[in-house]
């Protein structure tokens, strides 16, 4: 008699079930569907009050059969908390970060109740992927860019006066969306004029870091261990379209600074408790942590330069087998 497969929930980008490629998540779905009783649920489609999620099953050909709204129950739940691009107000949240925190609390509720046996990443760990978590770290110990939160624009003005400019970054965000480089008092005024008044962000949605030039480096983790790295030179930023020096290459042992960067990334990952995700550098400083929704590939235009999906799949399939 065949052993009963373990039930696994996998939260995915909602656009995946409508046909978007989403290669990292599709790789996971294909592999997990062979080894587990897999239920796919979509980020942004949680009914927080009723305690239900919108669920799907993978069908032949990579399509998805809707199962309706179900109560989460599984041996393992692999979560995805990167819905920063979704409209939080349409989901009943006045503040963007409240939408994020509701997801963290939702996962924790079902973990604590025993309805879900294990969550990757653990809810508290996903909570530490907010950039504001860096504000409580000793930047000298963890090689992070000093990070600040501000309760007023006057505090932002003070930060600009104290250095060579700052970067305002959404506390919960990615891909440079909503980021601003503030070099002067007039930059801060314009930034302030764009906040609130029914717009997408408020001051409390932002964190602030000193502007640091440098190459962008990423170290991917699966199971708490480094599985790949990449180095990006001369990429676009929210304030510059210049790509004269643009290049992407694997970042591996033997390259300049790799060993020191890896030690710093591993130290921060251990402190955070990160199981699946990535740690990003600008120059020689860590500027953010990415959680379980991280894309595990890097492309240069149409060419895949780094593909860390196999390592992610091995880890997640291994986690199922250990249940």
Predicted regions and their residues:
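Extreme N-terminal starter segment of soluble prokaryotic enzymes
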Residues: 3-9
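C-terminal active-site "lid" helix and adjoining low-complexity regulatory extension at the edge
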Residues: 3, 254-256, 270-274, 283-323
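Hydrophobic alpha-helical segments and helix pairs
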Residues: 124-176
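A short glycine-rich, hydrophobically flanked beta-strand micro-motif that places a catalytic Asp/Glu
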Residues: 209, 217, 274-284
């Amino acid at each position: 008699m065949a052993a009963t497969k373990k039930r696994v929930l996998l939260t995915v980008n909602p656009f995946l079930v409508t046909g978007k490629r989403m290669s990292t998540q599709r790789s996971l779905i294909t592999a997990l569907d062979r080894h587990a009783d897999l239920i796919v649920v979509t980020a942004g489609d949680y009914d927080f009050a009723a305690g239900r999620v919108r669920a799907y099953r993978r069908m032949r050909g990579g399509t998805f059969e809707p199962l309706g709204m179900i109560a989460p129950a599984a041996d393992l739940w692999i979560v995805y908390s990167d819905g920063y691009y979704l409209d939080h107000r349409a989901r009943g949240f006045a503040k963007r970060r409240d939408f994020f925190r509701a997801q963290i609390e939702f996962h924790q509720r079902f973990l604590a109740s025993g309805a879900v046996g294990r969550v990757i990443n653990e809810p508290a760990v996903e909570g530490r992927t907010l950039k504001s978590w860096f504000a409580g770290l000793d930047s000298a110990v963890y090689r992070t860019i000093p990070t600040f939160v501000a309760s007023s624009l006057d505090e932002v003005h003070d930060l600009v006066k104290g250095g060579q400019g700052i970067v305002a970054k959404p506390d919960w965000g990615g891909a440079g969306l909503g980021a601003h480089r503030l070099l002067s008092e007039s930059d801060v005024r314009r930034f302030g004029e764009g906040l609130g008044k029914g717009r997408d962000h408020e001051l409390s949605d932002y964190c602030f870091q000193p502007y640091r030039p440098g190459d962008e480096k990423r170290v991917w983790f699966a199971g708490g261990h480094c599985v790949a790295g990449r180095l990006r030179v001369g990429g676009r930023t929210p304030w510059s379209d210049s790509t004269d020096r643009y290049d992407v290459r694997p970042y591996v042992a033997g390259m300049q600074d790799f060993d020191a960067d890896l030690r710093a990334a591993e130290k921060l990952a251990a402190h955070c408790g990160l199981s699946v995700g990535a740690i990003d550098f600008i120059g020689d400083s860590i500027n953010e942590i990415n959680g379980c929704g991280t894309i595990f590939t890097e492309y240069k235009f149409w060419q895949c330069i780094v593909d860390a999906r196999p390592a992610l799949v091995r880890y997640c399939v291994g986690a199922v087998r250990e249940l």
